[in-house]
Protein backbone atom coordinates (compact mmCIF):
# COMPACT_ATOMS: atom_id res chain seq x y z
CA UNK A 1 0.00 0.00 0.00
CA UNK A 2 1.22 3.51 -0.85
CA UNK A 3 0.68 6.21 1.78
CA UNK A 4 0.66 9.98 1.18
CA UNK A 5 1.72 12.16 4.11
CA UNK A 6 0.87 15.81 3.56
CA UNK A 7 2.97 18.46 5.28
CA UNK A 8 2.90 22.22 5.55
CA UNK A 9 6.03 22.35 7.68
CA UNK A 10 4.10 22.64 10.93
CA UNK A 11 4.72 20.72 14.14
CA UNK A 12 1.29 19.15 13.68
CA UNK A 13 2.33 17.69 10.30
CA UNK A 14 5.46 16.24 11.86
CA UNK A 15 3.33 14.81 14.67
CA UNK A 16 1.00 13.22 12.10
CA UNK A 17 3.94 11.37 10.53
CA UNK A 18 5.12 10.21 13.94
CA UNK A 19 1.60 9.08 14.78
CA UNK A 20 1.39 6.95 11.64
CA UNK A 21 4.74 5.42 12.48
CA UNK A 22 3.55 4.61 16.01
CA UNK A 23 0.78 2.24 14.99
CA UNK A 24 1.07 1.22 11.33
CA UNK A 25 2.74 -2.01 10.30
CA UNK A 26 5.66 -1.03 8.04
CA UNK A 27 5.42 -4.41 6.30
CA UNK A 28 2.00 -3.49 4.88
CA UNK A 29 3.22 -0.15 3.54
CA UNK A 30 5.21 -0.46 0.30
CA UNK A 31 6.03 3.23 -0.06
CA UNK A 32 5.36 6.64 1.42
CA UNK A 33 5.12 9.87 -0.52
CA UNK A 34 5.74 12.98 1.55
CA UNK A 35 3.98 15.90 -0.12
CA UNK A 36 4.11 19.64 0.43
CA UNK A 37 2.01 22.05 -1.60
CA UNK A 38 2.91 25.67 -2.13
CA UNK A 39 0.10 28.01 -2.97
CA UNK A 40 0.58 30.06 -6.15
CA UNK A 41 -0.86 32.99 -4.19
CA UNK A 42 1.87 32.67 -1.55
CA UNK A 43 4.35 34.34 -3.89
CA UNK A 44 2.10 37.35 -4.51
CA UNK A 45 2.90 40.28 -2.20
CA UNK A 46 0.13 41.85 -0.15
CA UNK A 47 -1.36 44.99 -1.70
CA UNK A 48 0.33 47.19 0.91
CA UNK A 49 3.74 45.77 0.03
CA UNK A 50 3.65 46.77 -3.63
CA UNK A 51 5.97 45.14 -6.15
CA UNK A 52 9.16 44.09 -4.42
CA UNK A 53 10.75 43.07 -7.72
CA UNK A 54 11.87 39.86 -6.03
CA UNK A 55 9.16 37.43 -7.10
CA UNK A 56 11.68 34.82 -8.29
CA UNK A 57 13.50 34.90 -4.95
CA UNK A 58 10.23 34.74 -2.99
CA UNK A 59 9.04 31.74 -5.03
CA UNK A 60 12.35 29.99 -4.44
CA UNK A 61 12.12 30.59 -0.70
CA UNK A 62 8.59 29.11 -0.56
CA UNK A 63 9.80 26.08 -2.53
CA UNK A 64 12.88 25.74 -0.31
CA UNK A 65 10.68 25.82 2.79
CA UNK A 66 8.41 23.15 1.29
CA UNK A 67 11.42 20.99 0.41
CA UNK A 68 12.76 21.37 3.95
CA UNK A 69 9.36 20.33 5.34
CA UNK A 70 9.26 17.17 3.23
CA UNK A 71 12.87 16.36 4.14
CA UNK A 72 12.06 16.67 7.85
CA UNK A 73 9.22 14.13 7.57
CA UNK A 74 11.35 11.83 5.39
CA UNK A 75 14.06 11.91 8.07
CA UNK A 76 11.56 10.77 10.73
CA UNK A 77 10.57 7.83 8.51
CA UNK A 78 14.03 6.99 7.15
CA UNK A 79 14.82 4.05 9.43
CA UNK A 80 11.30 2.67 9.54
CA UNK A 81 11.21 0.46 6.45
CA UNK A 82 9.02 1.64 3.56
CA UNK A 83 10.63 3.56 0.70
CA UNK A 84 10.09 7.31 1.17
CA UNK A 85 9.88 9.84 -1.66
CA UNK A 86 9.43 13.60 -1.45
CA UNK A 87 7.44 15.89 -3.71
CA UNK A 88 6.55 19.58 -3.82
CA UNK A 89 3.57 20.70 -5.88
CA UNK A 90 2.03 24.10 -6.51
CA UNK A 91 -1.69 24.72 -6.31
CA UNK A 92 -4.58 24.28 -3.92
CA UNK A 93 -3.29 22.08 -1.08
CA UNK A 94 -6.38 19.86 -0.81
CA UNK A 95 -6.68 19.45 -4.58
CA UNK A 96 -3.02 18.58 -5.02
CA UNK A 97 -3.06 16.11 -2.12
CA UNK A 98 -6.07 14.31 -3.61
CA UNK A 99 -4.51 14.35 -7.11
CA UNK A 100 -1.26 12.87 -5.77
CA UNK A 101 -3.17 10.14 -3.95
CA UNK A 102 -5.10 9.24 -7.10
CA UNK A 103 -1.97 9.27 -9.27
CA UNK A 104 -0.15 6.90 -6.91
CA UNK A 105 -3.27 4.84 -6.16
CA UNK A 106 -2.64 5.53 -2.48
CA UNK A 107 -4.30 3.37 0.13
CA UNK A 108 -4.14 6.09 2.79
CA UNK A 109 -3.64 9.85 3.12
CA UNK A 110 -2.26 11.21 6.40
CA UNK A 111 -2.90 14.87 7.19
CA UNK A 112 -2.81 17.04 10.31
CA UNK A 113 -6.14 18.56 11.29
CA UNK A 114 -4.82 22.09 11.65
CA UNK A 115 -1.61 23.93 11.07
CA UNK A 116 -2.22 27.00 13.18
CA UNK A 117 -1.10 29.18 10.28
CA UNK A 118 -3.00 32.25 9.13
CA UNK A 119 -3.26 30.70 5.66
CA UNK A 120 -5.51 27.99 7.10
CA UNK A 121 -8.07 30.65 7.97
CA UNK A 122 -8.03 32.03 4.42
CA UNK A 123 -8.19 28.67 2.66
CA UNK A 124 -10.47 26.80 5.03
CA UNK A 125 -9.71 23.38 6.39
CA UNK A 126 -7.41 21.44 4.08
CA UNK A 127 -8.00 18.29 6.10
CA UNK A 128 -11.77 18.68 5.74
CA UNK A 129 -11.51 19.14 1.97
CA UNK A 130 -9.20 16.16 1.59
CA UNK A 131 -11.55 14.06 3.70
CA UNK A 132 -14.50 14.98 1.47
CA UNK A 133 -12.77 14.49 -1.89
CA UNK A 134 -10.29 11.64 -1.44
CA UNK A 135 -11.07 8.26 -2.94
CA UNK A 136 -9.08 6.41 -0.27
CA UNK A 137 -9.14 6.45 3.55
CA UNK A 138 -7.84 9.61 5.23
CA UNK A 139 -6.19 9.66 8.65
CA UNK A 140 -6.70 13.09 10.20
CA UNK A 141 -4.36 13.54 13.16
CA UNK A 142 -5.49 16.07 15.72
CA UNK A 143 -3.07 18.13 17.80
CA UNK A 144 -2.02 16.31 20.93
CA UNK A 145 -2.45 12.82 19.48
CA UNK A 146 -0.48 10.42 21.67
CA UNK A 147 2.45 8.79 19.91
CA UNK A 148 3.21 5.32 21.17
CA UNK A 149 6.38 3.34 20.63
CA UNK A 150 6.75 2.80 16.84
CA UNK A 151 5.64 -0.51 15.38
CA UNK A 152 8.58 -2.82 14.74
CA UNK A 153 9.40 -4.64 11.53
Regions found by a protein language model. Give the residues of each.
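Small/aliphatic-rich secondary-structure junction motif
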Residues: 1-53
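Intrinsically disordered or low-complexity boundary/linker segments at protein termini
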Residues: 1-19, 133-153
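Short, well-ordered secondary-structure micro-motifs
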Residues: 16-17, 43-47, 98-99, 121-122, ...
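General small-molecule cofactor/ligand-binding pocket signal
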Residues: 33-35, 85-89, 139
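Short secondary-structure boundary segments
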Residues: 36, 112-114, 142-143
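A short acidic, glycine-rich active-site loop
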Residues: 53-68
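Structural beta-alpha unit
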Residues: 75-109, 146-153
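Glycine-rich, Arg-bearing micro-motifs that act as flexible, cationic patches
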Residues: 108-129, 147
Amino acid sequence: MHVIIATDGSKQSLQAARYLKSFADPDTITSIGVLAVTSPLAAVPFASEGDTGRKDIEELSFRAAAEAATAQIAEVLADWGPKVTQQVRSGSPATEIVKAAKAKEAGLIVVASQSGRASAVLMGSVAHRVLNHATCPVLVVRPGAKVKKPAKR
